[in-house]
Amino acid sequence: MSIGLAVGLIVGLSILFFIIGGVVAFFVTRRLFQKQLKENPPINEKMIRAMFLQMGVKASESRIRQVMRSMQQAK
């Protein structure tokens, strides 16, 4: 086994493992992100309306938009 062959094999396997690691990391991250979105969905106007109705308050459109703005600024 020559030195050139050994170096080429090491470099080739390193690149291969790097690519495989990147693909695995992509899918793991994607799965975790989807799980987080499923457990904690983003709040929308419909959810805010439902929250106000549960509190027994009839919210105006301006109040709902104000709550949405405050939620976005809090991020």
Swiss-Prot record:
The keyword Transmembrane applies. It is found in: Membrane. It comes from the Bacteria. The keyword Membrane applies. Keywords: Membrane, Transmembrane, Transmembrane helix. Its main location: membrane. Disulfide bonds: none annotated. It is a single-pass membrane protein. GO terms for cellular component: membrane. The chain crosses the membrane at residues 8-28. Belongs to the UPF0154 family. This is UPF0154 protein MYPU_1460. It comes from Mycoplasmopsis pulmonis (strain UAB CTIP) (Mycoplasma pulmonis).
